[in-house]
Amino acid sequence: MKSNTKTLTEGPLAKQIFLVSLPLALSNLLQVLFNMSDVAVVGRFAGSTALGAVGSTSILVSLFTGFLIGLSGGINVLVARFYGARHEHDVEKTVHSAAIVSLIAGVVLLFVGLLGSPFMLRLLNTKDDLLPGAILYLRVYFLGMPALALYNFGNAVFSAIGDTKKPLMYLSIAGALNIALNLFFVIVCQLSVMGVALASAISQCASAGLILHALTKVQDCYVLDTKKLHLDPATTKSILGLGIPAGFQNAIFAIANLFIQAGVNSFDSLMVKGNSAAANADAMIYDCMAAFYMACASFMSQNYGAGKPDRVKKSYFISLAYSFGVGLILGGSLFLFGRTFLALFTTESAVIDAGMKRVGVMGFAYCISAFMDCTIAASRGLGKTVVPTIIVVMGSCVFRVIWVYTIFAHFHTIPSLYALYPCSWALTALAEIVYFAHCYKESMRIFEQPKAAA
């Protein structure tokens, strides 16, 4: 194996986690910028109706892309563990099985989006004036789902072995292409909503092509060889065992947010448009924090596989500290400069005022989510995904739905709606931390047994 294994299993952890997480954060931001540029371009050059149409799809986009990201998280953990343990043949089997699993998942979601968009948007009570544009946007956007699944697969593999720079470079290229195509399709071709969706789909294909090509050129056990592509039954079972709960976990948040979006849609179109603009801040801040969650899972999994229990626990606490700090700083900045941020997406002062109602509640709440998400990532790094998913279902999905139909139904104000985020994060975090403490002790016993035998 190459020496880049040392990136995760040797050296000062605080520095190494930061260096691995920084490109991940930038990569995540670029993925968010794909959708943000869609919103910004249509808001500026195609009008507020087009802005509302694109924004009203954000929950559904998050639902399905979240599932793919969760699936790739399972791939990341498995590759990292085998790579840390120097089980080269297992790494090879995981990479080639994961590529096929990812492609299948992307194709399935493609057809779900093409056929189910009208039903899902009506289920969200999407406004009649926004519905045609929203359906068109989703159907064109979902053409890029197989490519997005394959990009996330490649990103998971590179991140698992500590190389987060290549995904960043490829996303930078795709991001620049996305912005250029957005401007061309909307301003020059006057394609409005269809144009920005098409730009996103093309850009996703570009990023997937670049990262897959890079995987075929590496000189290590995680190289992608098209001749070796097959579904190894045992490996596929492990990938799905880790990835499906993680993907479902991500989807659960989006499902719960469907009820929140329905709550937003119960207000006038002005509030819907303001919410669409403000939601971009959520994505930016959350995805910056999420970089440390992926790093946490990778570092814990590799060090667990390498038999270094002392670095396993430290990886969790360092990642938690970083993600909490990022959430606090970025959330506070949004609270102070929210109007300037929202002006990037709309020139209508009434829409900005509406968006600030969300910012006012969420600004200092993001950091709370670090305790929940980083702990979930830590449990995943130890191979535990089922129980954390159950906790998320209860603490986030069920709790939020109950909140919408009780507290929000009673007050019916924007603050009463968005207050459920920090409350559900805190509740779920408490349960996740208790579970992680238990499974950590259980997982560390494997390192104590040889000493007891001596």
PLM regions with names:
Residues 1-21, 79-146, 188-244, 300-365, ...:
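Short alpha-helical transmembrane segments in multi-pass integral membrane proteins
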Residues 8-45, 59-74, 78, 103-110, ...:
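N-terminal transmembrane alpha-helices
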Residues 19-38, 140, 151, 174, ...:
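Transmembrane helical elements of multi-pass membrane transporters/channels
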Residues 33-51, 121-128, 184-191, 251-284, ...:
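Helix-terminus/linker motif at the lipid-water interface of multi-pass membrane proteins
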Residues 46-59, 134, 138, 197, ...:
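Small-residue hotspots at the loop-to-helix junctions and early N-terminal turns
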Residues 51-111, 148-167, 261, 274-338, ...:
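Small-residue-rich hydrophobic transmembrane alpha-helices
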Residues 63, 178-182, 208-212, 284-287, ...:
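Hydrophobic transmembrane alpha-helices of multi-pass small-molecule transporters
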